[in-house]
Amino acid sequence: MTSLPDLFDQYSEQIQIGKLELQSFGSRQSISGEIYTVSCSDDNSIAKDVLSREGNNKVLVIDASGVTHASMIGDQIAESAVKNNWAGIIVNGCVRDVEDLKNLPIGIFAKGTVAQKTNKKNHGFEDILISFGSVVMTSGKWIYIDRNGWLIADKKLEL
């Protein structure tokens, strides 16, 4: 993937820059891909279900409302994402099992970590408009993320 600064320099008028600092937890430090959106807080059932389906190298973006008291992604869900060909997972919230996540061949970015798991009541929505980090995202847009930050584009960017 081309570095984020290079994409910004070429496409500054066509992108949204994410203003939320995210940490990397998977083994891939930079990823890009078409977005698929999920909105769920305190319940990761929808995210787990989506990641159990074929991902076609997409990136699941989870708006967990920024909650820090429960983890949206752990090792088992992340392993399912790898098995089902997801390029990455972005979480406006927390993850857990970080020692296992760092060895998985996938990009995983989140606000932080917490050991507690979520409720399992099938609450949440998929394939909807979400907004965090000063950007608006819908399924079908593209996300680019590396150690420099992250950005959203309406379409795949080429350099």
Segment roles from a protein language model:
Residues 136, 149-151:
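Short, charged beta-turn/beta-strand-edge "cap" motif at the junction between a beta-strand
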Residues 1-139, 156-159:
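Feature captures the catalytic cores and cofactor-binding loops of soluble hydro-lyases/lyases
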